[in-house]
């Protein structure tokens, strides 16, 4: 398998693709057989996206009361959790959080809102005004994640200065009905297409540990490749009390790393960032993500869970002798 991986890595670097059957075979690797896979993923990453690390941060700009019933989400109105509930924060707070993210070393800053979609009118206008100020007053690049959007909303975001729209598929098409039944998978796919058509870059990934099979993780990766998204955030479930998945078992650190490596082989040219749940699932192996094909990570807090201190992540990067990208392009 080592020689096969070397040849597969060379094929991908030369512009070839990994076949679904090959990805499924690599998903069966265990133990020390994973190390050549990580090596191949790391070489592919360095060839296509370089060795600098991309850092991003987010603000939970509107929390709770979401009508969707996503099984993992603490903000769903269908669950009883301790997640905070509040309406859209004011413009000043969005800008202040952008400054804090920039201070912590992030080059990208996402404004995230709960709910199926953002309300047109005052809410969208407030976000657009904040984006304009962030553009003027900071050096950080703003992005938005406002749920399902149409062309009108996408165009308004472009006009305000948003470069990237974030919208996760969460899981594969075949597993999605087990995760959410309040909207259709195709609505999420269409949002990605709407954003791209409007001229936005798209950040789109998912979350692992929902009960999906390894084959379904690979299925999602190929869907992302078909959609030609620009960057791929990978999350690992951190079970929240009160949600349907509160008793779900965490994925093992090596399984997390194997998943990252497979996504790198399937999506060789994309920025792959490791976000929510990395502390809980990867534990002492968090630093290994960069040797398994990841090219970025989220620092600071997540939507409803706490991340580790930015200083710890910076120390990790220093210990690894990795430099940080100065922009999120």
Curated annotation (Swiss-Prot):
Keywords, comma-separated and alphabetical: 2Fe-2S, 4Fe-4S, Biotin biosynthesis, Iron, Iron-sulfur, Metal-binding, S-adenosyl-L-methionine, Transferase
Catalytic activity: (4R,5S)-dethiobiotin + (sulfur carrier)-SH + 2 reduced [2Fe-2S]-[ferredoxin] + 2 S-adenosyl-L-methionine = (sulfur carrier)-H + biotin + 2 5'-deoxyadenosine + 2 L-methionine + 2 oxidized [2Fe-2S]-[ferredoxin]
Entries under Gene3D superfamilies matching the protein: Aldolase class I (3.20.20.70)
Positions contributing to [4Fe-4S] cluster binding: 66, 70, 73
Keyword Flavoprotein: no
Any Pfam family hit: BATS
Magnesium listed as a keyword: no
Domain Radical SAM core: 48-278
Record's cofactor remark: Binds 1 [4Fe-4S] cluster. The cluster is coordinated with 3 cysteines and an exchangeable S-adenosyl-L-methionine.
Top enzyme category: transferase
InterPro entries (alphabetical): Aldolase_TIM, BATS_dom, Biotin_synth/BioAB, Biotin_synthase, Elp3/MiaA/NifB-like_rSAM, rSAM
Family under the similarity heading: Belongs to the radical SAM superfamily. Biotin synthase family.
Purpose: Catalyzes the conversion of dethiobiotin (DTB) to biotin by the insertion of a sulfur atom into dethiobiotin via a radical-based mechanism.
HAMAP family: BioB (MF_01694)
Protein name: Biotin synthase
Taxonomic lineage from the root: Bacteria, Pseudomonadati, Thermodesulfobacteriota, Desulfuromonadia, Geobacterales
């Amino acid at each position: 398998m080592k020689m096969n991986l070397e040849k597969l890595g060379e094929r991908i670097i030369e512009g070839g693709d990994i076949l679904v059957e090959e990805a499924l075979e690599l998903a069966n690797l265990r133990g020390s057989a994973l190390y050549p896979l990580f090596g191949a993923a790391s070489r592919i990453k360095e060839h296509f996206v370089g060795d600098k690390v991309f850092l991003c941060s987010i603000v939970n700009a509107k929390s709770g009361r979401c009508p969707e019933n996503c099984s993992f989400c603490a903000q769903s109105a269908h669950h009883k959790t301790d997640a905070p509930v509040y309406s859209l924060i004011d413009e000043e707070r969005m800008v202040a959080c952008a400054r804090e993210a920039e201070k912590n070393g992030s080059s990208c800053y996402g404004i995230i809102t709960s709910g199926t979609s953002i309300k047109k009118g005052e809410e969208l206008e407030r976000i657009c005004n904040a984006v304009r100020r962030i553009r003027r007053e900071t050096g950080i690049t703003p992005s938005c994640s406002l749920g399902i959007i149409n062309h009108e909303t996408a165009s308004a975001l472009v006009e305000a200065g948003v470069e990237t729209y974030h919208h996760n598929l969460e899981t594969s098409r075949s597993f999605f009905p087990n995760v959410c039944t309040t909207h259709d998978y195709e609505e999420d796919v269409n949002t990605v297409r709407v954003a791209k058509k409007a001229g936005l870059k798209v950040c789109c990934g998912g979350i692992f540990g929902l009960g999906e099979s390894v084959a379904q993780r690979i299925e999602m990766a190929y869907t992302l490749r078909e959609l030609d998204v620009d960057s791929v955030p990978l999350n690992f479930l951190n079970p929240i009390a009160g949600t349907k998945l509160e008793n779900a078992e965490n994925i093992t650190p090596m399984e997390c790393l194997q998943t990252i490596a497979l996504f790198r082989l399937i999506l060789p040219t994309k920025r792959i960032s490791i976000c929510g749940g990395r502390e809980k699932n990867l534990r002492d192996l968090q630093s290994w993500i960069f040797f398994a094909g990841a090219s970025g990570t989220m620092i600071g807090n997540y939507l409803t869970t706490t991340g580790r201190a930015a200083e710890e992540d910076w120390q990790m990067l220093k210990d690894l002798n990795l430099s940080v990208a100065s922009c999120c392009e």
